[in-house]
A protein has these predicted regions:
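Conserved active-site regions of diverse hydrolases
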Residues: 1-379
Length: 379
């Protein structure tokens, strides 16, 4: 009886915590890559002969029942955050230039990098997927702010989501088979650019920014498949089956990112920088799949793929025959080998909104908790 009562109380506390977020922010401003893009990529490159499978079924099958430009079977972390804040799903900027962005605007683009397209090419790590970088997205933001009456106030009352961004600066080299030694010099450059962009956003008016770290890519099918033939047994974590060195690399990136956020907090004490610990929020279900509703024997395999190790190969991508989708995406963490399922993104979002994986907790930065009602800005 006590256990049942305790379970009910915990559920009520979590529900109240999530509900209390409604009214915290009047809009969301989002940057990033495929972890956050809600539809920009198809409008940017839809007529291109290299149109990716992401805009084809079965993408979007679980929630939207059609492809939306999201790289998943359903909703992303940004969607769950928007819903928890009582806001509509965030509109992609490119597809909605004639729409209202009063409740949010999304500049994220599938495949985007933190570092500039030309710069990456010049150092031997070309982005063959898109020429959009974080700098491009900031230019779009400035273009947008110039079209509204008070762009500074709009940013002040918004929750700014900084991606995740930076993962593709490493993912593209990984897909090309680059070594750890080759990628290591990129990290300081990526962190510096993310940091300088955050400072620029604060100067433009942003006061609350959520900055995610990178996910454990050593657990992703595309990475596991890429290094399968060159890895030995000791290269894998016996508890999860994930590759150790890519995860260690991600931890290194995330540690430097947190140090950069600490530096910026000292320079701009009025701004609230929330570190979103995507890595540990995700590692929960790789360490204990069954506890979170996933099947242990397929936790490292893609739901939708063309076969091969981990059901991922570069020539049989999800959305393009003969690749096939699994019957139950909710039992998988990986959707297409590169991106996660809605079920996995939901767990990460819950870890940020209800758990210990947002530092500081998102409610501590809620303007509604710190301002009188008549001070709230309505755009």
């Amino acid at each position: 009886m006590f256990l049942v009562l305790a379970t009910i109380i915990i559920a009520l506390i979590r529900s109240a915590s999530t509900q209390s977020l409604a009214g915290c922010y009047e809009s969301i401003v989002s940057f990033g890559d495929s972890l956050a893009d809600t539809g920009n990529y198809p409008m940017l490159f839809g007529a291109d002969t290299h149109t990716p499978s992401y805009v084809l079924p079965p993408y979007g099958r679980t929630f939207f029942h059609r492809p939306t430009g999201r790289c998943s079977d359903g909703r992303l972390v940004i969607d769950f955050i928007a819903q928890s804040l009582g806001l509509p799903l965030v509109q992609p900027y490119i597809t909605g230039r004639d729409r209202s962005f009063s409740k949010g605007v999304n500049f994220a683009v599938i495949g985007a990098t933190a570092l500039d397209f030309d710069f990456l090419g010049s150092i031997g790590f070309p982005n063959t997927f898109t020429n959009v970088s974080l700098g491009t997205q900031i230019d779009w933001l400035k273009e947008f702010l110039a079209t509204i009456p008070d762009g500074r106030k709009f940013l002040q009352k918004s929750l700014v989501l900084m991606g995740e961004i930076g993962g593709n600066d490493y993912n593209h080299p990984i897909m090309q088979g680059s070594s750890l030694e080759e990628m290591q010099p990129l990290v300081q450059l990526v962190i510096h650019y993310i940091g300088s962009t955050i400072e620029e956003l604060i100067k433009l008016g942003a006061e609350t920014l959520m900055v995610p770290g990178n996910l454990p890519i050593g657990c992703f099918p595309f990475c596991l498949a890429a290094y399968k033939d060159s890895s030995s047994a000791q290269d894998y974590d016996p508890k999860t089956g994930c590759l150790n060195w890519p995860n260690d690399f991600t931890i290194y990136h995330n540690q430097l990112l947190q140090k950069e956020l600490s530096r910026i907090r000292e320079l701009y004490p009025h701004a609230v920088l929330i570190y979103a610990d995507y890595y540990n929020a995700a590692m929960r279900f790789y360490l204990s799949p069954a506890e979170y509703g996933f099947s242990k024997d397929i936790i490292l395999s893609a739901c939708c793929g063309g076969g091969g190790p981990y059901n991922y190969n570069g020539t049989g991508k999800c959305g393009i025959p003969p690749a096939r989708s699994c019957d139950d995406p909710a039992s998988y963490a990986s959707w297409d080998g590169i991106h996660l399922t809605e079920a996995a993104y939901r767990l990460i979002a819950q870890g940020l909104l209800q758990g210990p994986y947002a530092i500081p907790h998102i409610t501590t930065a809620c303007p509604a908790f710190n301002r009188d009602d008549d001070q709230l800005y309505h755009y």
